[in-house]
Amino acid sequence: RNLTLYGFAPEHDLQLQGKKIHFGTAGAAVHIVDSETREYRESTVADLYDIARLCDQMEHIHFFQRPIVCRDLDDPREMDFNTCYASISGTRKHVGTSFVQPEHVEDALKMLHLVSGGEAAWRARPFVSMSNCFVVPPLKFAEDASRCLEAAVRGGMPVLLLSAGQAGATAPAALARALVQATAEVLAGLVYVNAIEKGALAIFGAWPFISDLRTGAMSGGSGEQAVLMAGCAQMAQFYDLPSGIAAGMTDSKLPDAQSGYEKGYTVTLAAHSGAHLIYESAGMHASLLGCCPESYVIDNDMLGAINRTVRGIEVTDETLGLEPIRDVCITGPGHYLGHEETLSRMQTDYLYPEVGDRESVNNWLDQGSTDITERARERTRTILASHYPSHISPEIDEQIRREFPVRLSRERMGLLVGAGLEPAPTEEGLPFPPNF
């Protein structure tokens, strides 16, 4: 019941117990907002790598689940492999991904063994988990997904057990009944996992979605979505199970006012409901069909502030002590601006936004009167021009490229910078042979 999701680096390990909360990404968007043209286009494997290294620099995004589909890869096996490769190459945080066939899971496990230093090292610290829609609501197991689930469990990969019915379509329209169905489906998944391997690492992932009943379209930014996901988290708390829910799935297409208010109330309610993992909490738009790089930077500020509300007010004998009041009001200057407690708590009790604006009007005008999207876009450019993670050694990366069809060039990944390496002759890779 107390589960650890490991990062590639130990400082990114996530403890799923009690009321600890971790924010992360997720999604399967087929479009991305181009940062330069501001237009929607199909997402690529290079985009996925860029988003991973962008999130690697976001303090309040604690784990990285792949948010987009690599639309430039037609072969499903290559797409699954390169999705995993691009994600683990771009961040040292825990990574989540998914697979459509069990053979694809085996491909990824072989790569992960190489990166980890062997199968035993991987099993000791599995830093990649699989999101698995093992059920086709209402109340039916999905054959291919279940076979993927079996491959992951046997391979030592943690699994997020997803039930993603849509209220009014594949789940009841009554929210309480939709919650009942989703809970039953995920509990069935837990039984299935333990039948494969007792005590395997599994996360309660009841994700019933909301339909706009006027059109049948998903409405991820609705108030109904917020309360339904909060209810799922509370059911996991009731069963004392590690949980992951989804919030932040705005219906807006761009990082605008609608995006802000929908993400604000859905993620805040999720955080205060007791979920251990909150997926989709940054970057997503258009009810999960779109993604915007600048939104990760904007949402990082939001997540930090929300986490601060969860932390609450520290009430102890020390924080209630009257000595600072006595110092200021009786023997001091009558204000707390220079008091030692003010200075010491400046960094421990208070959080400061990275791109949010707190300047005076005059300072804001002097600095170009930019809005948050412009500042986030500039921050995104800076990170993507300079942050090229190197936690996977060039030797291991070269071996991966020899054995698998990697569809990201070293040049595009910045792996040649300062390394003195030439492009490998297998840079474009060979497709998986028919019986690989």
Residue ranges and their predicted role:
Residues 21-24, 157-162, 375:
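N-terminal glycine-rich anion-binding loops that anchor highly charged ligand groups
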Residues 294-436:
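Catalytic-core signal marking the mid-to-C-terminal active-site face
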Residues 229-338:
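Hydrophobic alpha-helical bundle architecture
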Residues 166, 209-212, 243-247, 279-289, ...:
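Short acidic (Asp/Glu) and glycine-rich catalytic loops that position anionic groups and cofactors
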Residues 1-33:
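Glycine-rich, N-terminal phosphate-binding loop and its surrounding beta-alpha-beta segment
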Residues 24-28, 164, 206-207, 282:
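Short loop/turn segments at strand-loop or loop-helix junctions that form parts
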Residues 34-276:
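Helix-rich catalytic cores of soluble enzyme domains
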Residues 18, 60-63, 419:
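A broad structural signal for short, well-ordered beta-strand segments within beta-sheet-rich domains
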